[in-house]
Curated annotation (Swiss-Prot):
The gene is PATL5. Transmembrane segments: none annotated. Gene3D superfamilies: CRAL-TRIO lipid binding domain, GOLD domain, N-terminal domain of phosphatidylinositol transfer protein sec14p. This is Patellin-5. Residues 1-263 are annotated as: Disordered. Residues 170-186 have a biased composition (Polar residues). 'Patella' means 'small plate' in Latin. It comes from Arabidopsis thaliana.
């Protein structure tokens, strides 16, 4: 078993550099590498594009049909022999000067063809194949050896010839030859299966579509609104998209080298695309894109954004009583913080000044109707203090708000909060009051902190059957979206159950990329790890894997200012932390391993070799049910080292978090 060690010298604690973590599939395109020959004839033929071939698991093979005339006439026996070989009757009608467009329009609906016409002489002869078998595609290549075409060339695709003849079963085709050299690749039109699918949509799927429409304009706030029970059942019952059954086409002739290569490439592309699509189905990203919060500095605004801000200022100046109006403690005019507030409304309306002004006016009127100023001083009790609370800040200094919906598993609390309309209204007022007080702690300074990080704990949260809770959260969500724009820096969902992920899959296609980039999801096994990516351990509550004890009845010698150190303990290894002591003092420390299931021990080793090692904590197995954070203190009477040892016997890595403090001894 390998052993790692970390040496720590007080008084400055060890610090660790923590870095911030940061639809329809495109159809395969057929690319033709042949160069387009220059136009040498006065005749300009416009070839109509044929409808696109229906998509299937195997790519339709595209074969070029090339007819190269050498003389004015072809021997009839050659054509007759060719017709016998393919069991088809082909009529070859020579024309002069121009090709008849009617023949080109007589193309099968489900075919994809490349027509190439190559002139050889000033006088052009057109040949048309008027009758082709319905389920076959014939490639006829005529290679002149002498002034007359030999029948053997049409009968057999010469193996040593540069232009072999191959027969590939695809839809019917027709070719024409004119004075002009043209290469036209037409793609068939894909049938519109979406219309058929919608017409046959089951009621459960219609419920999901209706739920999606509700989220067409998901804004900054994305609190965990509980979906309808019928919607969740629909999400769970929707089967995976059926893949078209593979169809095995008849093997192409071995002599058609270009067709075989094209088919192999197409099959490889289909296989790779299918693998990518399958991965996208089963993967649920924990982070849905990177998002960099705007600084709200005027110098960072584009010219368009700056013009919009100036126009919104002008609209406020010409309006009545704007100079006497304030919001969240910030005057709307003649204040350094005003621009930060106005930019929130502008961003919520895509920098459209008139719409932002309308939204701001509606918000001001709602605040009057809701009696926000009186609400701040209203006593609504402390029953919900464990449901929603502020604690610490993230690594970008945003205050962190925790929403713990599992508290509503308490039946008494649930009934007391949601049993009737009056109690739900009181809950709504309490939620708005809490948010207003939190916003008043923001600085609204350009380049400062004017947003909040939201952590939503969905562990043991009531399911979709709790109608009263769903109605209350939906109403709160609408108020937050309409009247508190751009106040969330990031939404972190932890302990996410399966039903919420199913619900999110329904609404996510209708959310803007900017809104989705603020969302982070983590299941129960990764919740602590995810929080520690965005929030330092000294700010993460102990119940979520950190060291913060703001809302715990714990005796702690540490505050948020005491930086913690994170160390990854590799599987089946032992990690030792050294705290070197140079003087007589008292050392206090906190240590925890996220999830524990390790052995922990502590001892003091004096520098004097004749001294005795003091066992502070005998090695013992720590489980997840033990205390979340282990706190110790030791009075040191001589120079030496305190060794904290963590032995990880498991096959998974563990996160070790610790911090310590040196307290000088009182003068005796």
């Amino acid at each position: 078993m390998s052993q790692d060690s970390a040496t720590t010298t007080p008084p400055p604690p060890l610090t660790s550099d923590v870095s911030m973590p940061s639809g329809e599939e495109d159809e395969p395109k057929h690319v033709t590498s042949e160069e387009e020959a220059p136009v040498t004839s006065e005749t300009n033929l416009k070839l109509p594009l044929m409808p696109e071939l229906e998509e299937s698991n195997h790519t339709a093979e595209v074969v070029s049909e090339k007819v190269t005339p050498e003389t004015m006439t072809l021997e009839s026996e050659g054509l007759n022999h060719a017709a016998e070989d393919s069991e088809q009757t082909h009529e070859v009608t020579p024309e002069t000067e121009t090709a008849k467009l009617e023949v080109l329009n007589h193309t099968a609906e489900d075919s994809e063809q490349t027509h190439e016409v190559t002139p050889e002489k000033e006088t052009v002869k057109s040949e048309f194949l008027n009758h082709v078998a319905e389920d076959s595609e014939q490639t006829h290549e005529v290679t002149p050896e002498t002034e007359t075409v030999k029948s053997e060339v049409l009968n057999h695709a010469a193996e040593d010839s540069e232009q072999p003849r191959g027969v590939t079963p695809t839809p019917e085709t027709e070719t024409s030859e004119a004075d002009t050299s043209l290469l036209v690749t037409s793609e068939t039109e894909e049938p519109n299966h979406a219309a058929e699918d919608y017409s046959e949509t089951e009621p459960s799927q219609k419920l999901m579509l209706e739920q999606r429409r509700k989220y067409m304009e998901v804004e900054d706030w994305t609190e965990p609104e509980l979906p309808d029970e019928a919607v969740l059942e629909a999400a769970a019952s929707v089967p995976e998209p059926k893949q078209p059954e593979p169809q095995t086409p008849p093997p192409p002739p071995s002599t058609t080298t270009s067709t075989v290569a094209s088919r192999s490439l197409a099959e490889m592309m289909n296989r790779e695309e299918a693998e990518v699509e399958e991965k996208q189905k089963i993967q649920i990203p924990r982070s849905l894109g990177s998002f960099k919060e705007e600084t709200n500095k005027i110098s960072d605004l584009s010219e368009t954004e700056l013009n919009a801000l100036q126009e919104l200022r002008h609209l406020l100046q010409v309006s009545q009583d704007s100079s006497k109006t304030s919001i969240w403690g910030v005057p709307l005019l003649k204040d350094d913080r005003t621009d930060v507030v106005l930019l929130k409304f502008l961003r919520a309306r895509d920098f459209k000044p008139q719409e932002a002004y309308s939204m701001l006016n509606k918000t001001l009127q709602w605040r009057i109707d809701f009696n926000i100023e009186e609400l701040l001083d209203e006593n609504l009790g402390d029953d919900l203090d464990k449901v929603v609370f502020m604690q610490g800040q993230d690594k970008e200094n945003h205050p962190v708000c925790y929403n713990v919906y599992g508290e509503f598993q308490n039946k008494d609390l649930y009934q007391k909060t949601f049993s009737d309309e009056e109690k739900r209204e009181r809950f709504l007022r309490w939620r708005i009051q809490f948010l207003e007080k939190s916003i008043r702690n923001l600085d609204f300074v350009a380049g400062g902190v004017s947003t909040i990080c939201q952590v939503n704990d969905l562990k043991n949260s009531p399911g979709p059957g709790k109608t009263e809770l769903r109605l209350a959260t939906k109403q709160a969500l609408h108020l937050l979206q309409d009247n508190y724009p751009e106040f969330v820096s990031k939404q972190i969902f932890i302990n996410v159950p399966w039903w919420y992920l199913a619900f999110y899959r329904i609404i996510s296609p209708f959310m803007s990329q900017r809104s989705k980039s603020k969302l982070v999801f983590a299941g129960p096994s990764r919740s602590a790890e995810t929080l520690l990516k965005y929030i330092s351990p000294e700010h993460v509550p102990v119940q979520y894997g950190g060291l913060s004890v703001d809302n715990c009845e714990c005796n702690s010698d540490f505050t948020h200012d005491d930086i913690a150190t994170e160390i990854t303990v590799k599987p089946t290894t032992k990690q030792t932390v050294e705290i070197i002591v140079y003087e007589k003092c008292t050392i206090v420390w906190e240590i925890r391993v996220v999830g524990w299931e390790v052995s922990y021990g502590a001892e003091f080793v004096p520098e004097n070799k004749e001294g005795y090692t003091v066992i502070i904590q005998k090695p013992r197995k720590m489980t997840a049910k033990n205390e979340l954070v282990v706190s110790h203190s030791f009075k040191v009477g001589e120079v030496g080292r305190i060794l904290l040892t963590v032995d990880n016997p498991t096959s998974t890595k563990k996160m070790l978090i610790y911090r310590f403090k040196v307290k000088p001894l009182a003068c005796e």
